[in-house]
């Protein structure tokens, strides 16, 4: 059985379609590798790109794409709703078939070293490829974002510990090139589902409250003396925040479901929907960013479909309708479900 690995570079450009096309076209003709998805978001000013194929081909494609994005994107003029650290904010490798997490971590390390050496850009390793436990979470590495990077790399004031402050490879002092490129985080992880719940409000006041309630880390509260205590969140292995989507006139609870078996999409959706209802606001649908495992769709489909339905296609249809996945853009199952998209690409 041929090994297949997925790679999901997130680039910090979601508005200039011609620029996005130049970046993605740079890897369009690499043998053994297919581009499964290109999803730009103007509000986030970010594009999620999904590629999959033979490990050596995907690793080659990841380097070419990162190099092109570094050339094309100028972080000095970048603004968007989504947290980011550099021109390519994050680039994870995900084992799909016939490849181990350890092999994906080795791919991440080789790529991080190559990008730092050949592109002269600071790179961090995260997830299962992290060289320090404090760097496992992307959200930890990304604290302070691009705007805090200069102080972070210039021994200035920062919220980072010494263990997370400096990159694993590449320059460790701020310079003009880094001001343009920012830093890049490369790693390996299991399948993560990027899942956003649409909230019918123009600002993100309720979305932010919901995000702080559902995310696993919860929120800080203060007593009358000003002492702080962290209250855990509702959902398991979930990161979440509220953001505004000006282009659609709504807001979202933007989440990463780090283990979709422990927190299925319908659980996250119904939790957000109930909390929004408590504020007199509707959550009319949701959005998947990137690709999703078939099993995750089937699990949610079983919740929304009539009892006794077992056909995969019917369960997927029930999940799409129940979660409102086509509210913003049509959800095309053959292109968005990992197993189906890979089969389609291999057949071509």
State each model region's role.
Residues 1-348:
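Long, contiguous binding/interaction regions
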């Amino acid at each position: 059985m041929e090994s297949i690995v997925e790679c999901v570079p997130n680039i910090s450009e979601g508005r200039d379609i011609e620029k996005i096309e130049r970046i993605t076209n740079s890897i369009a003709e690499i043998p053994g590798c297919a581009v499964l998805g290109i999803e730009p978001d103007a509000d986030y000013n970010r594009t999620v790109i999904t590629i999959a194929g033979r490990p050596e081909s995907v690793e080659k494609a990841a380097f070419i794409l990162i190099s092109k994005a570094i050339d094309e994107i100028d972080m000095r003029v970048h603004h968007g709703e989504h947290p980011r650290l550099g021109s390519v904010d994050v680039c994870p490798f995900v084992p799909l078939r016939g490849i181990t997490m350890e092999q994906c971590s080795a791919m991440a390390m080789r790529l991080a070293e190559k990008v730092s050496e050949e592109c002269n850009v600071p790179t961090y390793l995260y997830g299962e490829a992290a060289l320090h436990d404090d760097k496992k979470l992307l959200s930890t590495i990304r604290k302070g974002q691009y705007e805090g990077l200069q102080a972070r790399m210039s021994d200035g004031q920062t919220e980072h510990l010494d263990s997370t402050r400096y990159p694993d490879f590449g320059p460790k002092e701020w310079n003009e090139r880094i001001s343009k490129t920012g830093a890049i985080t490369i790693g390996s992880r299991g399948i993560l589902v990027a899942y956003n719940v649409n909230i019918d409000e123009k600002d993100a006041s309720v979305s932010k409250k919901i995000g702080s309630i559902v995310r696993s880390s919860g929120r800080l509260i203060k007593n009358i003396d000003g002492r702080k205590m962290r209250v855990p969140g509702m959902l398991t292995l979930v990161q979440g925040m509220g953001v505004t989507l000006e282009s659609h006139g709504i807001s979202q609870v933007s989440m990463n479901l780090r283990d979709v078996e422990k927190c299925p999409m319908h659980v996250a959706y119904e939790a957000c929907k109930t909390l929004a209802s408590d504020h007199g606001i509707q959550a009319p649908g949701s959005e998947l960013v990137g690709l999703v495992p078939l099993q995750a769709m089937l699990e949610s489909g079983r919740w929304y479909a009539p009892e006794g339905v077992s056909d995969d296609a019917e369960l997927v249809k029930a999940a799409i309708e129940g979660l409102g996945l086509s509210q913003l853009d049509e959800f095309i199952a053959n292109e968005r479900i990992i197993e189906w998209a890979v089969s389609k690409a291999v057949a071509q």
